[in-house]
Amino acid sequence: MTNQLPRVVTIRELLEAGAHFGHPTNRWNPKMKPYIFTARNGIHIIDLQKTVAGLSQAYQFITEVTARGEKILFVGTKKQAQEAVMEEAIRAGQFYINRRWLGGTLTNFATMKRRLKLLSDLEEQRDRGDFARLTKAEAAKLEEKIDRLNRVFAGLKGMDRLPGAIFIVDPRKEELAVREADKEGIPIVAMVDTNCDPDPIDYVIPCNDDAIRGIRLMTSKIADAAIEGMRRRESSQE
């Protein structure tokens, strides 16, 4: 089966992105042992053959999800991940959270949809000039509300149902997102470093989840997979 998987990244690309550097050996999760190649100068070195295989499996899965017409939710709120998560999700026409995970995003989706509708309605009212009929103070208050909602929900606009899969940069930091996705039965694809627990992750991509270049590389590959799946869907409907 592995031979049939798309080979979407090279060892060289991974090395250049620093994807092989794990955490100090005293900060590891023993469950990551199968993904570790060796230790050097007190740092675990990730087995990049496993990274290639993990990304290939994740790529194929994401392609299948978007080919069915479902969406991917990209999640990465750590500073190093914020820009890549937003830009790659937008490029692929998917959803993202890159500032703060709000509890209940997946497990209390009915409330989430109401907030998204409120944001949409307020922006619509502003854009057609309704705010001009209000006092300056009232208009400023509503603008502030739009800004506040956008800080949390900008990447979720248009999301009217739960995603078909979730892609996470650093599941240790995004523990709440992992728990909610697991509870809702949403498959999880994640960049998993040597200090993480891989057990809740359906598609483990073992790699450095702190290096900006590594995060950009992995996130862009997942975005490519989403785009490929959407193209397949379009072709099948022609």
From Swiss-Prot:
<dbReference type="InterPro" id="IPR005706">
    <property type="entry name" value="Ribosomal_uS2_bac/mit/plastid"/>
</dbReference>
<dbReference type="InterPro" id="IPR001865">
    <property type="entry name" value="Ribosomal_uS2"/>
</dbReference>
<dbReference type="Pfam" id="PF00318">
    <property type="entry name" value="Ribosomal_S2"/>
</dbReference>
<dbReference type="InterPro" id="IPR023591">
    <property type="entry name" value="Ribosomal_uS2_flav_dom_sf"/>
</dbReference>
<dbReference type="GO" id="GO:0006412">
    <property type="term" value="P:translation"/>
</dbReference>
<dbReference type="GO" id="GO:0003735">
    <property type="term" value="F:structural constituent of ribosome"/>
</dbReference>
<dbReference type="InterPro" id="IPR018130">
    <property type="entry name" value="Ribosomal_uS2_CS"/>
</dbReference>
<keyword id="KW-0689">Ribosomal protein</keyword>
<dbReference type="GO" id="GO:0022627">
    <property type="term" value="C:cytosolic small ribosomal subunit"/>
</dbReference>
<keyword id="KW-0687">Ribonucleoprotein</keyword>
<protein>
    <recommendedName>
        <fullName>Small ribosomal subunit protein uS2</fullName>
    </recommendedName>
</protein>
<comment type="similarity">
    <text>Belongs to the universal ribosomal protein uS2 family.</text>
</comment>
